[in-house]
A protein has these predicted regions:
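Short acidic helix/loop segment immediately C-terminal to the autophosphorylated histidine
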Residues: 134-141
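Conserved catalytic submotifs in the C-terminal HATPase_c
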Residues: 179-184, 201, 206-215, 252
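Conserved micro-motifs of the catalytic ATP-binding
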Residues: 173-178, 216-219
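Short helix N-cap motif at coil->helix boundaries in the Bergerat
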Residues: 185, 267-278
Length: 331
C-alpha cells in the first residue's frame, strides 16, 4: 500500500510500522518499542496523538516535511484503537503523501492566474481605446486609424493566446494525435523560412536553412512545422538586429535525428534556462508582451517533441546567443 501506517500500543510505543511509513519519514532502523518522539522527533505528530487520545475521535492534519527533493506534504490521520471491552488499546496513524497533488493544485492556480492576466491585459487595452474613440477620437481620422491599428494588434494577440491555449490543452490531454510518417526535414525548414521571411526582413535578420537535403524523420509534418516556426520566431524576436538565425540538423550517433535553431542574440541567463519551457514563463516579460508573445510557444514545442518520443533542451552562454535542440526518431 502507498499509505504509511504506524500503530502505537497502550503505552504509546511503536508496535507496528510499514515500509511506506519508513520511506515517508526516512526511517532506517527498527523503531518498534520506541515512543513516537524517540522514533520521529516531531512535536506536531506527538500533539496529534495527544489530541486523539484526549478526544477519542478521528483527527487529521497536514504535515510539511523537509526532504532532499524539497518540501514534502503529508496528510496525517489518527484514530484510537479500541479493545473488545471498549477501552483504548492504542492508536493508529495513517499518512498519505499528497505532495504531487499539492504541486498540481499550485500549477492549476498559477495557470488560471496567468491566463486571467494574459486575457485581461489586451481586453483592457481594447476597451480603453474603444472608449476613447467613442468620446470623440473617431472624428479625427489620423488618431482613429492609429487607435484602430492598436485595437487590431491586441485582438490578434487574444486570438493567438486562445489558439495556443487550445493547442496545449489538447496536447496535455492526449487529444492531439500525431500523424507520424516520413517527413522531409529540409523541406519543412524551408517552409518555415518562407513563412517567417517578412518578420526576418523587418528585423534585418538573415534566415539560414542548413538542414541537410535528404535528412528525414518519423514525424507529424504539420506539428513539426509548428515546432520550428515557434523556435525560429523566438530567435528572430530575441536575436540581435542584423544577425543570423540558423536551422540545422544531423543524424545523431544514436538512432535519432537532431534538429536545432541557433541565434546570435544576447543569450539566456543560466538561472532562466531550466524554466524556459514552462507555460507563461518569460525571460524578458515586458519585451515578450511588446512583441506579441503568448508565453506558451516553448511549452507547445516541448509537448509536441515529447509526443514524438523526443527530447528538447537549450544551450546558451550570456552574450553568445541560444541554441534550441530537439530529437526525433529517424525515418
Amino acid at each position: 500500500m502507498s499509505e504509511g501506517v504506524l500503530v502505537l500500543d497502550a503505552d504509546g510505543r511503536v508496535r507496528l510500522v510499514n515500509q511506506a511509513f519508513e520511506r515517508l519519514f526516512t526511517i532506517t532502523g527498527d523503531i518498534r518499542g520506541r515512543t513516537l518522539m524517540e522514533a520521529l522527533r516531531l512535536h506536531q505528530m506527538q500533539e496529534l496523538v495527544n489530541t486523539t487520545l484526549l478526544k477519542g475521535q478521528i483527527e487529521h492534519f497536514e504535515l510539511e516535511l523537509a526532504a532532499l527533493e524539497g518540501t514534502r506534504s503529508l496528510q496525517v490521520n489518527s484514530a484510537v484503537v479500541l479493545g473488545g471491552d471498549g477501552r483504548q488499546q492504542g492508536l493508529i496513524l495513517v499518512c498519505h503523501d499528497q505532495t504531487r497533488l499539492k504541486q498540481l493544485e499550485n500549477t492549476r492556480r498559477e495557470f488560471v492566474a496567468n491566463v486571467s492576466h494574459e486575457l485581461r491585459t489586451p481586453l483592457s487595452m481594447i476597451k480603453g481605446y474603444v472608449e476613447t474613440l467613442l468620446d470623440g477620437a473617431k472624428d479625427k481620422p489620423e488618431v482613429a486609424t492609429k487607435f484602430l491599428q492598436t485595437i487590431e494588434k491586441h485582438a490578434d494577440r487574444l486570438t493567438y493566446l486562445i489558439e495556443d491555449l487550445l493547442t496545449i490543452s489538447r496536447l496535455e490531454s492526449g487529444q492531439l494525435v500525431m500523424n507520424l510518417q516520413r517527413a522531409d526535414l529540409h523541406g519543412i525548414a524551408e517552409h518555415v523560412v518562407t513563412d517567417l521571411g517578412d518578420r526576418a526582413v523587418a528585423k534585418q535578420v538573415k534566415l539560414l536553412n542548413q538542414v541537410p537535403v535528404g535528412l528525414a524523420a518519423q514525424a507529424d509534418g504539420e506539428r513539426l512545422r509548428q515546432v520550428l516556426f515557434n523556435l525560429v520566431d523566438n530567435a528572430i524576436k530575441y536575436g540581435r538586429t542584423d544577425g543570423n538565425v540558423v536551422i540545422g540538423g544531423r543524424k545523431a550517433e544514436q538512432p535519432e535525428v537532431e534538429l536545432w535553431v541557433r541565434d546570435d542574440g544576447p543569450g539566456i541567463p543560466p538561472e532562466a534556462q531550466p524554466r524556459v519551457f514552462e507555460r507563461f514563463y518569460r525571460v524578458d516579460k515586458a519585451r515578450s508582451r511588446d512583441d506579441g508573445g503568448t508565453g506558451l510557444g516553448l511549452a507547445i514545442v516541448k509537448h509536441i517533441v515529447q509526443s514524438h518520443g523526443g527530447e528538447v533542451w537549450v544551450e546558451s552562454e550570456p552574450g553568445q546567443g541560444a541554441t534550441f535542440h530537439f530529437t526525433l526518431k529517424p525515418a
